[in-house]
Amino acid sequence: MSSGAETRGRKKSWLGKVVSDSMDKGIVVAVERRVQHPVYKKYFKKTTRLMAHDENNEAGVGDLVRITECRPLSKNKSCRLVEIVEKAK
């Protein structure tokens, strides 16, 4: 029997903007994606808000960040901050 680590896929990662950093060691990231309407075929934006773990409280509101999925860290938090791509001005 093969080990479970070989059969698992890659973890998802998202690029988004920090919309809240008021939690201790936590941030809320808004991730935008383009979705096509099933009937009218027009593209529009949908926003998903994900809570992520920020161990050092280094991300601020307006920063562009990369987050990745991980094991559940709390009721709503199952992502980690990987890097800050661009700091807010």
UniProtKB/Swiss-Prot annotation:
NCBIfam families, alphabetized: PRK05610.1 (NF004123), uS17_bact (TIGR03635)
An annotated Gene Ontology molecular function: rRNA binding
InterPro entries (alphabetical): NA-bd_OB-fold, Ribosomal_uS17, Ribosomal_uS17_bact/chlr, Ribosomal_uS17_CS
Xref: Pfam families: Ribosomal_S17 (PF00366)
Lineage: Bacteria, Pseudomonadati, Chlorobiota, Chlorobiia, Chlorobiales
Keyword presence, Ligase: no
Gene that encodes it: rpsQ
Entry protein name: Small ribosomal subunit protein uS17
Keywords, ordered alphabetically: Ribonucleoprotein, Ribosomal protein, RNA-binding, rRNA-binding
Biological function: One of the primary rRNA binding proteins, it binds specifically to the 5'-end of 16S ribosomal RNA.
UniProt subunit comment: Part of the 30S ribosomal subunit.
The family this protein is said to belong to: Belongs to the universal ribosomal protein uS17 family.
GO cellular component terms listed in the entry, alphabetical order: cytosolic small ribosomal subunit
Domain of life: Bacteria
One Gene Ontology term from the biological process aspect of the record: translation
